[in-house]
Regions:
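Internal helical hairpin/lid segments
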Residues: 222-296
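A short helix->loop->beta-strand "cap" motif at the edges of active sites that frequently abuts
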Residues: 77, 102-108, 127, 268-269, ...
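Conserved anion/nucleotide-ligand pocket segment
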Residues: 131-215
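ATP/nucleoside-binding phosphotransfer catalytic cores, i.e., glycine-rich phosphate-binding loops
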Residues: 269-349
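Conserved beta-alpha junction segments in alpha/beta enzyme cores
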Residues: 22, 29-37, 197-240, 245
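ATP/NTP phosphate-donor binding region
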Residues: 1-77
Length: 349
């Protein structure tokens, strides 16, 4: 990848961790889940979660949310930033941010979904981040935090080791409604996962990642906020996933095709596609239909990628998106996609 990234230094136990709501302020709507998430976060990391004025303020303005992000970067005691959840309007927050503050004191940022906006903003500043980690989804609900999430959370914030990305063997599309007290104690309905699907030549690729939630990437490109030419992704690893909006496979294919027409697909050496959610609280097809929907998205994406870059190593099914358990992955940091051994390794330095 032609663009070099700064990797922020790790936090240490006792440091402050900013907990922000750059999109939807889920802690204000569902405080019980949030408070359990904060207790678990402190126990698992030894860090001190610090909330800001809009962390629990549902409906806060874009400028107010941006002020909290700027304040977190400006505070030398804060050694990491965690977004509680995504949403659908973070694109309006980005113009209010002060890039000089982030450049002056880069910090690990973790978030998923709509936080793709912040990841790409940091990318434009030359700062690596970590895709995943929404506390309201992965730390607060259920009887405990999933092992793969704990390991990648600690690696991203504290330890910086190299981890093999493996399949947890089970997955859920959606948890119990957070308004239900049972959400504090139980996971959603989980089902066995399928083996990951591999395509492309049998070769090993190592490169920095770029990507995020596919729908949000489309917004960012439409707004003209990708700061480099597609050639800047040369040799990199594209990571893409789809949201709880449950886009039909053909619409997913249209977005991926647009990436191809922009030159992104031909630039990268590998593509990781997350296991997609195919159900929610109101739409729960039978198991066979859910499997078919996942297969349709897989086949559509692989077909489009292969047209633009038949030499790309492609792996489909990796749980780094909107399903749970979730791996947090580097964004701007290196990942090895080994098409020979069919293994994936992520470097969290």
């Amino acid at each position: 990848m032609a663009h070099e990234f700064v990797r922020p230094r790790k936090a240490r136990p006792g440091d402050h961790l900013a907990v922000l709501s750059p999109s939807f302020a889920a802690p204000g709507a569902y405080p019980g889940i949030h408070e359990q998430a904060m207790r678990r976060l402190a126990d698992l990391t030894g860090l001190v979660p610090v909330e800001y004025p809009t962390t629990r303020q549902v409906g806060a303005s874009a400028a107010a949310r941006a002020a909290d992000i700027n304040a977190a970067f400006a505070d030398p005691q804060v050694r990491g930033i965690l977004a509680v959840i995504g949403g659908d309007d973070q694109i309006t927050v980005i113009p209010h941010l002060d890039g000089d503050l982030a450049r002056a004191d880069p910090k690990p940022f973790l978030g998923t979904s709509d936080n793709t906006n912040l990841h790409h903003w940091l990318c434009g500043l030359g700062i690596a981040s970590f895709y995943g980690g929404s506390s309201q989804v992965h730390l607060g609900p259920g009887p405990a935090v999933d092992d793969i999430h704990v390991r990648s959370l600690r690696a991203a914030l504290l330890t910086g080791e190299r981890l093999e990305i493996t399949d947890p063997g089970e997955s859920e599309d959606i948890g119990i409604d957070w308004a239900d007290p049972q959400a504090l104690k139980s996971f959603g309905e989980r089902e066995p996962t399928e083996p990951w699907s591999w395509y492309g030549p049998p070769r090993a690729v190592t490169g920095p990642t770029w990507g995020g939630c596919l729908e949000v990437i489309q917004w960012i490109l439409t707004a003209g906020r990708f700061p480099f030419s597609p050639e800047a992704l040369h040799g990199g690893v594209l990571i893409i996933e789809t949201s709880e909006e449950l886009l039909p496979a053909r619409e997913v294919g249209w977005i991926v095709r647009s990436l191809g027409e922009r030159g992104f697909l031909s630039a990268v050496d590998a593509v990781l596609v997350a296991r997609p959610p195919v159900s929610d609280h109101t739409r729960r097809p039978p198991a066979a239909d859910r499997a078919r929907l996942r297969e349709q998205q897989r086949d559509t994406v692989v077909d489009v990628v292969s047209r633009y870059n038949p030499e790309a190593v492609v792996c489909v099914g990796v749980p780094f998106g909107h399903t749970k358990p979730q791996w947090i992955l580097p964004h701007g940091g290196p990942i090895t996609v080994d098409g020979v051994e069919r293994r994936i390794f992520a470097d969290y330095r």
